[in-house]
């Protein structure tokens, strides 16, 4: 029996797919989607557009005669997606994936009951695709927030932090196996440990930094309200050369009233304090943030506050999302803003983000830098990362640290040439 997994969404889903492949490999032949008889769709439910896309994909696969197992967040968010699937497997039932496949073949059954499983304890089973030098390591499931626009909470639930020792062991195994970039992922890395009584992310980073070998760690998204409360300890942990000086800190709006409506539990000032502290502590920090445009209560004045915040704090990456109502969330009960207004606000913010990104990157042109090559690209050019996680397109073998000279840049990446190839 041939089984394939198709993954959508965040790095947490990618890590979940690695675990499922491990369980499946002992029972089935893992194949491409084209050759598979059963396809597991590991779904994302962040926005309505993605949900519709996934449902269409499931219907297409069924028309081809394939059985479809729905996994991921839509198992708890979308009744329509569940109705299309031949079986379903929620994120806290990954160890039952073999049963879910047999259920799709022999009689529909849903594996969606609420359970707590420490996914770090399954890490030794992971079957990663050796496409690059990156290993994704989950550190927790769920979050402490109650954002009024977010449906992911329905799928992932309250925060459950995984065993620190098991996480460190997984990172150590990955480094020994040749992976050079460890990506720590969760719905909110800054909340790690808080369900156990204290903030434990800095301690986790210190322990991973002590692993022997040359590698880098990318810390995933953390919310401002957690980062600001452990700022000194967090910056101290980031001082290790093994930790990318990369900070993904979503502000979502530049207006505190909108943040209250979103139930974000932080202020604009919290975000600014964290960004300024990191920039004052390190020579080069890559700041990434998220903005939702067109939230139902966002006025024109509120939007321009978001615009001015981005203009003033100059993040390198701004993930811009046009608000879309998710069924069952408090925000879905509010009157929506017309689509053309959302589109126009998104365009203005995108133009600003591209301008700032280009200006931020120009200062590196002409410099020689040591980078880690992490992914294969096209036409002999691969993706590498600076110590700040800034993207560099260059030559070099995946998994190797190389010296490059930056020749040019775009708003979202630098273009480098191997220093050894520079004309004398």
From Swiss-Prot:
The keyword DNA-binding does not apply. Residues 1-106 form the MTTase N-terminal domain. Residues 129-359 form the Radical SAM core domain. SUPFAM superfamilies: Radical SAM enzymes. Residues 362-420 form the TRAM domain. InterPro entries: Elp3/MiaA/NifB-like_rSAM (IPR006638), Methylthiotransferase (IPR005839), Methylthiotransferase_CS (IPR020612), Methylthiotransferase_N (IPR013848), Methylthiotransferase_N_sf (IPR038135), MiaB-like_arc_euk (IPR006466), rSAM (IPR007197), rSAM_horseshoe (IPR023404). It catalyses: N(6)-L-threonylcarbamoyladenosine(37) in tRNA + (sulfur carrier)-SH + AH2 + 2 S-adenosyl-L-methionine = 2-methylsulfanyl-N(6)-L-threonylcarbamoyladenosine(37) in tRNA + (sulfur carrier)-H + 5'-deoxyadenosine + L-methionine + A + S-adenosyl-L-homocysteine + 2 H(+). Its EC number is 2.8.4.5. [4Fe-4S] cluster 2 binds at residues 143, 147, 150. Its cofactor is [4Fe-4S] cluster. Keywords: 4Fe-4S, Iron, Iron-sulfur, Metal-binding, S-adenosyl-L-methionine, Transferase, tRNA processing. It is an enzyme of class 2 (transferase). CDD domains: Radical_SAM. [4Fe-4S] cluster 1 binds at residues 10, 44, 73. One of its GO terms (molecular function) is N6-threonylcarbomyladenosine methylthiotransferase activity. Binds 2 [4Fe-4S] clusters. One cluster is coordinated with 3 cysteines and an exchangeable S-adenosyl-L-methionine. The keyword Iron applies. Belongs to the methylthiotransferase family. CDKAL1 subfamily. Catalyzes the methylthiolation of N6-threonylcarbamoyladenosine (t(6)A), leading to the formation of 2-methylthio-N6-threonylcarbamoyladenosine (ms(2)t(6)A) at position 37 in tRNAs that read codons beginning with adenine. This is Probable threonylcarbamoyladenosine tRNA methylthiotransferase.
